[in-house]
């Protein structure tokens, strides 16, 4: 049996630690859930296309993706998307639609309680 080590990326480990700390400080479980989802192996981490974000959101929604946002599809309304990584095409399409592509840390600062945030995988 191989010992489970978790992510080796130092920045990701720091983010997971910060998410857990914020969860305990604020008494909110959403950040602990996001930390758990980011801790999974890379092959099991979320990869969400722009088309899926467009399909399941409406104008003004806030979405968090515990993984990567990819650029397939079109975005037809403004949304705020927070994710671990964005492809160049995805970031460009979100900004062209009038939305924002931000980091998970930035979303934690803006909305410490995590209210109204949609988790998308």
Curated annotation (Swiss-Prot):
The keyword Nuclease does not apply. GO terms for cellular component: cytosolic large ribosomal subunit. This is Large ribosomal subunit protein eL18. NCBIfam families: PRK04005.1. PROSITE patterns: RIBOSOMAL_L18E (PS01106). Transmembrane segments: none annotated. It comes from the Archaea. Keywords: Ribonucleoprotein, Ribosomal protein. The keyword Protease does not apply. Belongs to the eukaryotic ribosomal protein eL18 family. Part of the 50S ribosomal subunit. It comes from Thermococcus kodakarensis (strain ATCC BAA-918 / JCM 12380 / KOD1). GO terms for molecular function: RNA binding; structural constituent of ribosome. GO terms for biological process: translation. SUPFAM superfamilies: Ribosomal proteins L15p and L18e.
């Amino acid at each position: 049996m191989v010992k489970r080590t978790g992510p080796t990326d130092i920045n990701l480990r720091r983010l997971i630690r910060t998410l857990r700390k914020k969860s305990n400080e604020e008494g909110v479980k959403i950040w602990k859930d996001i930390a758990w989802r980011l801790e999974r192996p890379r092959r099991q981490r979320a990869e969400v296309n722009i088309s899926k974000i467009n399909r399941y959101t409406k104008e003004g929604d806030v979405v968090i993706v515990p993984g990567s946002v990819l650029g397939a599809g079109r975005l037809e309304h403004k949304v705020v998307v927070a994710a671990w990584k964005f492809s160049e095409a995805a970031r460009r399409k979100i900004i062209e639609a009038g939305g924002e592509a931000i980091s998970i840390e930035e979303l934690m600062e803006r909305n410490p309680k995590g209210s109204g945030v949609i988790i998308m995988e």
